[in-house]
UniProtKB/Swiss-Prot annotation:
Species of the source: Emericella nidulans (strain FGSC A4 / ATCC 38163 / CBS 112.46 / NRRL 194 / M139) (Aspergillus nidulans)
Active site as annotated: K271 (proton acceptor)
Biased composition regions of type Polar residues, renumbered to the chain: 342-351
Activity across pH: Optimum pH is 8.
Residues the record marks as carrying a glycan: N234
Domain of life from the UniProt record: Eukaryota
Keyword annotations: Calcium, Glycoprotein, Lyase, Metal-binding, Secreted, Signal
Subcellular location: Secreted
InterPro entries: Pectin_lyas_fold, Pectin_lyase_fold/virulence, Pel9A-like_beta_helix, Polysaccharide_Lyase_9
Gene3D superfamilies with a match to the protein in the record: Single-stranded right-handed beta-helix, Pectin lyase-like
Regulation: Inhibited by iron ions. Activated in presence of the surfactant polysorbate 20, while inhibited in the presence of Triton X-100 and sodium dodecyl sulfate. Inhibited in presence of the organic solvents methanol, ethanol, propan-2-ol and acetone.
GO biological process: symbiont-mediated disruption of host cell wall
Protein name per the record: Pectate lyase PEL9
Amino acid sequence: MMGKSVWVFAALFPAVLAADIYVSPDGSDDAAGTIDAPLQSIQLAVDQATAGSTIYLRGGTYTPTSNIQITKSGTASAPYVLRAYEGESVIIDGEELPGTPADLDASLDNADRGILHIQDAEYWEFYDLELINGPYGVYARDASNNHYERITTRNNYETGFQLQGESSNNVVLYLDSYGNRDPRKNGESADGFACKEGSGEGNILRGARLWNNVDDGLDLWYAVNPVHPRISANTSREFKSAVTIEDTIAWGNGFNRWDFTPFEGDGNGFKLGGGDDTDIGPADHIITNCIAFSNAKDGFTDNSQPGNFVLTRNTAWDNTAVGFKFGTAVATLTGNIAASNGEAPTSLSDEQISDGNSWDGDEDWDDGSFVSVDVSLVQGERNADGTIEPSGFLLPADGEEIGATTDWSA
């Protein structure tokens, strides 16, 4: 009889096993981790947390000397949560971590990548965190079923947010990633958001802004000889599964703001593939309601990816080279706009399926074709829920319902 009573109690009151934990830059690791007696170390809070726990970070700047390792998993019904406390501003400054910056041509050990290093971990949720000056901001490897919302990754010494390895069903919502650069590679690989070297279905990037990064805004390329204990040094892999990208804006990427010599940055808004020709496999990416503007190279490019893409109502404006460049993928392009790009609106092979796009008609599209080309309309502070204010930015002046809109609730 007692055994049954214990089971009923555990079923009715599981939360007693998952206490919330509080952390503050002014806390103490000898404290209890309560709101009145917070810990100081985020890592200690992560280590003490159990599935279902919420770790609340009080406002201020945290300056860890080793990165935050997240290597355990919650469950769908009892996820771990790491978040800022009730609207307070939380900055995690990685300037004291290894690789900030690494020397030119130096390698960066897998374990040292990221202010948040998330590996072999599932069912975590992250909210309202700002990650700066780190060896990557967020580095998630072999990590699935995680949720990231209203994260800022800026001025890191590698890619702001990188998802890698066998990773699936991750949602990245309302990411701001900007000013990321890589002195160890002279600009070759620091992107705003990257999904590389692996596979996994169900990954979604939505509502991101990716700007002024040294390489690309978004990069789905893969790197040669990744540093990982389970991968041969002679192996190279791209991300070989579909990624869904929605309501995302990339601008100002690929310019040498750091005086790197020689400069190796690419400067695409959305680079949707690439890598070693002997190892490329098709990935059927879906890109909807995205904008690429004022990037140093192309707006949207397959970069040798052979998948079947679907691009619906996207806009490429004022990029230095080509708006939409697809030669190896077979892309179904519907309702997209290319205007005022430096070299050409498009560069499309005969295999592309194009219908109802700006270049399919007789009209010549230029700045005057839009309600507004005021870039400040998509810059600045977000709304509390992570959206940006809807505006007339790059909307067709004649009211035609093509191209991207900044009304992300539509």
